């Protein structure tokens, strides 16, 4: 084997070999259980980020683990067309390169442009996924707009429409005036901002008076421009100030519209003035109030967010109405919405109706892609009736057919599903699945799989002109069909029979509603088993947290704290990293701050760590459902782990290749150390499998690390040396056999988390075991064997380790050179302790570097010594001639003084109010941690001073 571990040399060639050999495919053995994971499809033109790397590492670990258990495994891969995101990228591209808009191109040509862009950049993410070692079946790769998936989408739309579960209606949506499309709640970013609350007088009609004798109500609003669309004023029915006015009217300022006063819980007595203006066409809460009181809806805005020239008036059901005039005062027509706000306030003030303006903290919705304030807008959209679909989806989780890990996310799911709103599925975009609906000139709507079918079903001749709906479906609509459409539905395929329901879905909790819930609803509606019972899309939902930076901040381009997973694999220089973080930024003014932070954090750029180290770190940080603060130190630690495993394997191979390892017979004697490591490994297998089976990848990674680093490398390899340097033939054969057996098993155990290094080493080790198989990927996963439990070997070895560590600690504390042989005396020995010493003198002398071992008679106190107490004995190391008492005390005093200096430095820092107020929580916690560490170190040194002073 190469002297040093170089992941760059082994990873890519190995992956290409695996893929070419077809190892990632299902084994097709239908007598075995199936195990299937559907990858959450990343955006086709996107690139891999830490969230992908994290979730995909977890999925690949599960898939490799199940594949090694002989199951028929499928990891279904594919990408998402990502409607709005992809369209925006291409719009920006043609604007920058050609100075054109999509309208200059026209719909067909612009869509061709997007397909071109997909062909050009669509391979980036799948290339990057290969670099992670993902063992997905590439031959089955799907795209949400490929022909098969597009047919499935049409099929679902048509069937739901025919079942009256899809309808077209006029409803309020989140409208992005910049992108001119409806967007989902997930694409709305709520920002806290400082605003105002305007208090405006609305004169009472018909000579009515309020309880305080005034002839007006004062209405509080944060959006005075929408006053032009008011159709009511709400007061709380319990409010003594106003309850007698319910059913009376006010005259709307500026417009002179006569609008009713309604009693509604939506008006809080304590908030503002207790009177709320109701604008059903421009506010989600008002829309609901309007429905409860049958108030008309008046839309005053264009799709660009400007004031219309004349308003649109609708009744509660969304039909056009003439109950109110559609006139808008000329001075406000065509004004941009925020200019209109100023103009309305000025006009109200001029009439003497502006009572006061108060500062007010409010939450303002922004479109996360367009970056402008979102407007609730009354538009014609297509909707899915969600309550019918939600009922079985709630029951599936209630009765345990689907389980969430961790369980607390079920509550989040229930709270949303039990209060579900109809789902707006239409988007005013060009890129996506076009809605399969056609209109004739009279505005009648026909839904079908294609125009030909529509004409045939509805007996429409060629003389009837039809135009297809311009809108496309919400991206989440096609994603909701992902688990079954990718397996060939609506055809009844073998794949669907074998792999559906899938086994586990790995997802972030932020998309429980947008994706997880909708997959459950759609799947249970369309997929039934042979008895007609609805099928679930998956049995388990494993929820991951978000990956944040080391200070707990969300990773984002604007913060400049994004780390590309492949930069940790391959390494990146500081100039390249700076270019990546500050090049073509949306907000260039942040570049300087980002540059400084990056230079401080990565003065030399990022070193290459290899894929296995990245995967190990991700697995180790995967504590269920919690957000993860990324830690470069952990990544370095796991790269060191890979080096340690590599070097340990070289040691094993150097000592066993060309030797008789007992795989072809011959007498074998196992030493205590051999018996111990076999028993220890057996226990490790049990604990490790339990961790993987319960989705505790963090615990599994910890078990693997602890066994490999501490038990196998640090202890067992050392404990083999006495046998290697002087054992009998049978003993040598026993130790060689154990070394190879445990290493080979360990490589299989570790393979799901660190596939590249384990395969590379295993190819050498398998020869010694007489294994002829091609790849570790298809080897059986290690199994716990209850008959291999060896309590005696475990107990005896733990005792020896205790004794060796005690001697090593005395050396360190007394500053004795590691190579100097020592005398060891044992006092007050139990029978077990004496037996253990007598049976294992060779081990003890070699590993603790001892010149002699003497068990003292019961009444012998022994010479002046440093002592340590272990189980069933007291260890003594005589100090005569080993240390100079005065020098040693002086050295310790110096150490104590140095540590006291550090302690007072940190204490002063933490006492500085300015530092505590400014520094991030994480930095303060780190300082406190350091302080604790120094305090412990000082206590230990003082203890040592006392021991030496007493000699």
UniProtKB/Swiss-Prot annotation:
Please provide the Gene Ontology terms (biological process) for this protein. valyl-tRNA aminoacylation
Name the InterPro entries on file. aa-tRNA-synth_I_CS, aa-tRNA-synth_Ia, Anticodon_Ia_Val, M/V/L/I-tRNA-synth_anticd-bd, Rossmann-like_a/b/a_fold, tRNA-bd_arm, tRNAsynth_Ia_anticodon-bd, Val-tRNA_synth_C_sf
Q: Does the keyword Cytoplasm apply?
A: yes
Q: Which residues form a coiled coil?
A: 880-944
Where is the motif ('KMSKS' region)?
A: 554-558
A GO molecular function term, named singly, is: aminoacyl-tRNA deacylase activity
**Motif span ('HIGH' region)?**
42-52
Q: Where in the cell is it found?
A: Cytoplasm
Alphabetically list the UniProt keywords: Aminoacyl-tRNA synthetase, ATP-binding, Coiled coil, Cytoplasm, Ligase, Nucleotide-binding, Protein biosynthesis
- An example Gene Ontology CC term for this record: cytosol
Pfam families in the cross-refs: Anticodon_1 (PF08264), tRNA-synt_1 (PF00133), Val_tRNA-synt_C (PF10458)
Q: Where does ATP bind?
A: 557
**Domain-level remarks:** ValRS has two distinct active sites: one for aminoacylation and one for editing. The misactivated threonine is translocated from the active site to the editing site. The C-terminal coiled-coil domain is crucial for aminoacylation activity.
Subunit text: Monomer.
Q: What does this protein do?
A: Catalyzes the attachment of valine to tRNA(Val). As ValRS can inadvertently accommodate and process structurally similar amino acids such as threonine, to avoid such errors, it has a 'posttransfer' editing activity that hydrolyzes mischarged Thr-tRNA(Val) in a tRNA-dependent manner.
Q: Which NCBIfam families match?
A: PRK05729.1, valS
Instruction: List the protein's name.
Output: Valine--tRNA ligase
Q: Which organism is it from?
A: Shigella dysenteriae serotype 1 (strain Sd197)
């Amino acid at each position: 084997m190469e002297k040093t571990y170089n992941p760059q040399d082994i990873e890519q060639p190995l992956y290409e070999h695996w893929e070419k050999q077809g190892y990632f495919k299902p084994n097709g053995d239908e007598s075995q259980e199936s195990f299937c994971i559907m990858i959450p499809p990343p955006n086709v033109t996107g690139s891999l980020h830490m969230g992908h790397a994290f979730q995909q590492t977890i999925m690949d670990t599960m898939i490799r683990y199940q594949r090694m258990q002989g199951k028929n495994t499928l990891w279904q891969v594919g990408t998402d067309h990502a409607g709005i995101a992809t369209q925006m990228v291409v719009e920006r591209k043609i604007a920058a390169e050609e100075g054109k808009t999509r309208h200059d191109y026209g719909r067909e040509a612009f869509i061709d442009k997007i397909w071109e862009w997909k062909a050009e950049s669509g391979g980036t993410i799948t290339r990057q996924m290969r670099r992670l070692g993902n063992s997905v079946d590439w031959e089955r790769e799907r795209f949400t707009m490929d022909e098969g998936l597009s047919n499935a989408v049409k099929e679902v739309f048509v069937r739901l429409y025919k079942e009256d579960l899809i309808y077209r209606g006029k409803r309020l949506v989140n409208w992005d005036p910049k992108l001119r499309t409806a967007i989902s709640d997930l694409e709305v970013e709520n920002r806290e901002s400082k605003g105002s609350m305007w208090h405006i007088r609305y004169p009472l009609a018909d000579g009515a008076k309020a309880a305080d004798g005034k002839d007006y109500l004062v209405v509080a609003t944060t959006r005075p421009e929408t006053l032009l669309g008011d159709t009511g004023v709400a007061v709380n029915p319990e409010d003594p100030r106003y309850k007698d006015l319910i059913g009376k009217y006010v005259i709307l300022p500026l417009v002179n519209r006569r609008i009713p006063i309604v009693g509604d819980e939506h008006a809080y007595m304590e908030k503002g003035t207790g009177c709320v203006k109701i604008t059903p066409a421009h506010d989600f809460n008002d829309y609901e109030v309007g429905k409860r009181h049958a108030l008309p809806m008046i839309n005053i805005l264009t799709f660009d967010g400007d004031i219309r020239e004349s308003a649109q008036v609708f009744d509660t059901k969304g039909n056009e109405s003439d109950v109110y005039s559609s006139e808008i005062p000329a001075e406000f027509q065509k004004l941009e919405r925020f200019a209109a706000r100023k103009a309305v306030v000025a006009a109200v003030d001029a009439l003497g109706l502006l009572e006061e303006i108060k500062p007010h903290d409010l939450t303002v919705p922004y479109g996360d892609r367009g970056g402008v304030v979102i407007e609730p807008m009354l538009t014609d959209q297509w909707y899915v009736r969600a309550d019918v679909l939600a009922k079985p989806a709630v029951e599936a989780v209630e009765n345990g057919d689907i389980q969430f890990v961790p369980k607390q996310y079920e509550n989040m799911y229930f709270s949303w599903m039990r209060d579900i709103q109809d789902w707006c599925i239409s988007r005013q975009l060009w890129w996506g699945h076009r809605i399969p609906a056609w209109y004739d000139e009279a505005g009648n709507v026909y839904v079908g799989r294609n125009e030909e079918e529509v004409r045939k079903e509805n007996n429409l001749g060629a003389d009837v002109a039809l135009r297809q709906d311009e809108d496309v479906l919400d991206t989440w609509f096609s994603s909701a069909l992902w688990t079954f459409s990718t397996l060939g539905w609506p055809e009844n395929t073998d794949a669907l029979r074998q792999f559906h329901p899938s086994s586990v879905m790995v997802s972030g909790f932020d998309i429980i509603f947008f994706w997880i819930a909708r997959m459950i609803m759609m799947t249970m509606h369309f997929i039934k088993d042979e008895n007609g019972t609805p099928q679930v899309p998956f049995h388990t939902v494993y929820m991951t947290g978000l990956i944040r930076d080391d200070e707990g901040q969300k990773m984002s381009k604007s913060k400049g704290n994004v780390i590309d997973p492949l930069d940790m694999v391959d390494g990146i220089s500081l100039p390249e990293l700076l270019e990546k973080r500050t090049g073509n930024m949306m907000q260039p003014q942040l570049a300087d701050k980002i540059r400084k932070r990056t230079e401080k954090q990565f003065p030399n750029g990022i070193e290459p760590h290899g894929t296995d180290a990245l995967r190990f770190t991700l697995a180790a940080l995967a504590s269920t459902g919690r957000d993860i603060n990324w830690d470069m130190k952990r990544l370095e630690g796991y790269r060191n782990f890979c080096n340690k495993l590599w070097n340990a394997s070289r040691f094993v191979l150097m000592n066993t290749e060309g030797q008789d390892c007992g795989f072809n017979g011959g007498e074998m004697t196992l030493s205590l150390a051999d018996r111990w490591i076999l028993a220890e490994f057996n226990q490790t297998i049990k604990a490790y499998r339990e961790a993987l089976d319960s989705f505790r990848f963090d615990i599994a990674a910890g078990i693997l690390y602890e066994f490999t680093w501490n038990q196998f490398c640090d202890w067992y390899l050392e404990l083999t040396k006495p046998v290697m340097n002087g054992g009998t033939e049978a003993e040598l054969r026993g130790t060689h056999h154990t070394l190879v057996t445990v290493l080979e098993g360990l490589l299989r155990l570790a393979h799901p988390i660190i596939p590249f290094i384990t395969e590379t080493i295993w190819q050498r080790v398998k020869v010694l075991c007489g294994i002829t198989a091609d790849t570790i990927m298809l080897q059986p996963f290690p199994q716990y064997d209850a008959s291999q439990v060896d309590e005696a070997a475990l107990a005896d070895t733990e005792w020896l380790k205790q004794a060796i560590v005690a001697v090593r600690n005395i050396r360190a504390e007394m500053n004795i050179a590691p190579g100097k042989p020592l005398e060891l005396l044992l006092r007050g020995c139990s029978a077990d302790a004496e037996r253990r010493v007598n049976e294992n003198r060779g081990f003890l002398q070699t590993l603790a570097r001892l010149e002699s071992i003497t068990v003292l008679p019961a009444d012998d106190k022994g010479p002046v010594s440093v002592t340590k107490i272990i189980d069933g004995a007291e260890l003594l190391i005589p100090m005569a001639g080993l240390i100079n008492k005065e020098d040693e005390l002086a050295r310790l005093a110096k150490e104590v003084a140095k540590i006291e200096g550090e302690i007072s430095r940190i204490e002063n820092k933490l006492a500085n109010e300015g530092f505590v107020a400014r520094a991030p929580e994480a930095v303060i916690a780190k300082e406190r941690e350091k302080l604790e560490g120094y305090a412990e170190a000082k206590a230990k040194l003082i203890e040592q001073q006392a021991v030496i002073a007493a000699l």
